[in-house]
């Protein structure tokens, strides 16, 4: 019911305490003057897709990076905006709820009111459906009072539908025109921000004055690229899940007779599973990216787990904890191919009851091999982004079932001489995504809300609010905005020899980097985690004292700060221009040419190599 949105919440004592917490702002967002430096024009990270993206987004592709500056910064060509006319801005939650989303709204509201008390923030009720139907709630400080630093999306509600069809895009355009909006802020993940880019392009084409800004909020942690280090909600989800996992680890060690198979929410990528493993040290994690890269079959995975169980049994250990990402099922080559066939038939209108008889022989054989509960789940209609309904497919039960069958077989054959294998299965996801957000997510979301205002004040359209250098204290965060089109890639599929299918430009989920430092840390400890029971319990989410300022391990071990390095490069280039100018000596000119030629050759080689290897999910 729309009438339920925005009503005051009944708060516990802890919630009341959290509602009083005021997130810190970086220096560049303080005060009432917006200082923005626009850098060089951006390009797509893949040269092969740049042409396709530029054709699809002629008005918003190639826009410059925006850096917001502190008052003491001395930048000659900075734009200083001190006049702030009243604005009308709309905000909408798209996609699944993620802890911290409410603080984006709070930060945006505060920034609007600080710069002009007459500005208005309208929240669309019920997500994208409310956007299409022009259902709004004026967000006020009174309404926000019981939602500050709180979990969920119940302030405004949400939908998970895409803004995809021509009718939906035009409905959004009509809404923004009718409500005379200066800005529209879309809060969501990869799909929602792809939609934001499309809306921005459509609005620019239609000469609609509404500027569209995206905010990276998703528990999956898969909206990562050179501009976005992590997502709002990821820290909270991983901390809450890690506590649950570590509790299970302690239980396993106490009873010493169960193997726990735990599936974690997170869609196609395995970021949540990787982070939770580094925080809680379970015996084993199976990452979807590893499985896809090694082309491991269902039987390979079963053998891998069984061999681990047998190795532990030889040390008289009959317990363990194994983590699986929910996207694992789509990473197994033969199961992925089966799902593609099933989804194709479902889209053709074939009844689920008749699917099995219309599968290809090999797909039919695999389908018939699977236990009945998995068959039923694989027949579910796919999501709007064409992926399987991953949260509904009990991969943990499938793997436990196959491992149990194989261990019983080994026991019968005499190749395994240990105790009977016992499995217990869990799915962690819904338990965490409505949690009170962590201190980091509260700060990060609030800062991004303020950045949204700065983006709109600078008149930028088709941008995503960004904060980088996040592993450092808030006062060292770099605030800016990047064109969403620069984050896009274009998928290509080899349909058959000599024929390639090209997809639409989109932000694709970022996979776990199997060459990254976080994965390297996991591999370094994998054998010890498997055999030595080094279970680690981070405890409940902390808001004060030890642990309150902890950030995701995967964020802290990676050396990111792309925006900072872009600024540093610009400083070096400016120095070169200062030194090498008409009138400089021959020696200086020759040295500059020699160095530049070498640098250019190296960068061209590195660029082509890295782009060839970049494969989004």
Curated annotation (Swiss-Prot):
HAMAP family: Phosphofructokinase_II_Long. GO terms for molecular function: 6-phosphofructokinase activity; ATP binding; diphosphate-fructose-6-phosphate 1-phosphotransferase activity; metal ion binding. The gene is PFP-ALPHA. This is Pyrophosphate--fructose 6-phosphate 1-phosphotransferase subunit alpha. Keywords: Allosteric enzyme, Cytoplasm, Glycolysis, Kinase, Magnesium, Metal-binding, Transferase. Allosterically activated by fructose 2,6-bisphosphate. Pathway: Carbohydrate degradation; glycolysis; D-glyceraldehyde 3-phosphate and glycerone phosphate from D-glucose: step 3/4. Tetramer of two alpha (regulatory) and two beta (catalytic) chains.
